[in-house]
Amino acid sequence: MNRRDFLMTSSCFLATPAVALAAQAYAPGLVKQLLSEGKTVFVDYTTEWCTTCAAQKRTLARLLKETPAYGQMIEFVTIDYDQFGRGELAKELGISRRSTLVLLHGDQELGRIVAGTSSKQIKALLDIALSAAMAA
């Protein structure tokens, strides 16, 4: 391997976030199943092309790196808004747009952020989720 190949390969690893959001890809019924198991579920309605969604993902990845308990205690589910934005769950939750983060536990919605990218705001939602998960 020559130096150029090594540098190009190495730069790919540096561009990858240190902690990726370990979210489950959505399938109909998944969120209800997790809730019936007593889990605290953090739902992210997102798209590949949404810049606000990308900012939310970066913030979530950083917060998960800072507080690993979030990833250990909370179930994260990513829902493609383009595919499921008009689906049954979206209707039940009243989801009107992408870049919506919803926190669920049991049969209750514990919090919601619509198009917010503030680290403080997202951390507050994660803290509520962590408290709910630990109390369960």
Residue spans for each PLM region:
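Typically the conserved alpha-helix immediately C-terminal to a functionally engaged Cys/Sec
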Residues: A54-P68
